[in-house]
């Protein structure tokens, strides 16, 4: 009912991909009252990704942060639309983490969950969502009680026997396994190893990000 109007609004605001999903059993444990999600995606600059050559760069760090901020702004447009229609909407920031003693390096809702359910792409061996733009994409999510229906079918993983990202990862954080829906993230990616390795690059800035697994991904070519 609202999907086309909402997609038009968010694309005009700067999104490159929009997805809608009914979460079912995949609801956020912290916010189970929201059974639907709007996934907002914005692709990263190919020129910036090309600056990554075996190590993270200042160009990528700055672009990463700017893209996240843009996504958060677009998410607020979605919140306004949904709440003006009489529903509730909770924005989940593009770069979000709410660590506790049990679950480090996780947020209140995985962006990839909503993106996969909406049919925007599949989870690759690098732990990232592979979309029509490859894995060089950032996401924000809006959780809501507005009834929404996925516009595309769920996609299977197409990584096959490729091990490029695993071999390129300096932290050894990528297992090289195919992601199985419902499995824990740790089966394909060790977030702690990745985070610990990035401490080497504190000179770039607080919260520096790597991007090597994106830069070598064949789906970005």
What are these regions (language model features)?
Residues 1-68, 73:
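Non-catalytic, usually N-terminal nucleic-acid engagement modules in DNA/RNA processing proteins
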Residues 66-221:
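Catalytic cores of enzyme domains
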């Amino acid at each position: 009912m609202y999907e086309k109007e909402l997609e038009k609004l968010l694309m005009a605001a700067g999104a490159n991909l929009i997805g809608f999903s009914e979460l079912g059993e995949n609801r956020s444990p912290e916010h189970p009252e929201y059974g639907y999600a709007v996934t907002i995606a914005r692709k990263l600059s190919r020129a910036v990704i090309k600056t990554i050559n075996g190590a993270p760069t200042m160009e990528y760090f700055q672009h990463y942060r700017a893209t996240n901020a843009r996504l958060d702004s677009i998410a607020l447009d979605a919140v306004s639309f949904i709440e003006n229609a009489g529903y509730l909407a909770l924005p989940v920031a593009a770069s979000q983490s709410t660590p506790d003693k049990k679950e480090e390096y996780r947020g209140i809702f995985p962006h990839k969950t909503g993106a996969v359910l909406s049919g925007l792409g599949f989870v690759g061996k690098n732990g990232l969502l592979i979309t029509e733009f490859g894995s060089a994409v950032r996401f924000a999510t809006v959780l809501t009680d507005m009834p929404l229906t996925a516009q595309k079918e769920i996609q299977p993983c197409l990584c096959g026997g490729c091990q490029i990202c695993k071999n390129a990862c300096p932290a050894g954080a990528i297992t090289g396994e195919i992601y199985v829906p419902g499995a824990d993230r740790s089966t394909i990616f060790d977030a702690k190893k990745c985070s610990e390795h990035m401490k080497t690059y504190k000179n770039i800035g607080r919260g520096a990000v790597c991007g090597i697994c994106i830069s070598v991904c064949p789906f970005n070519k």
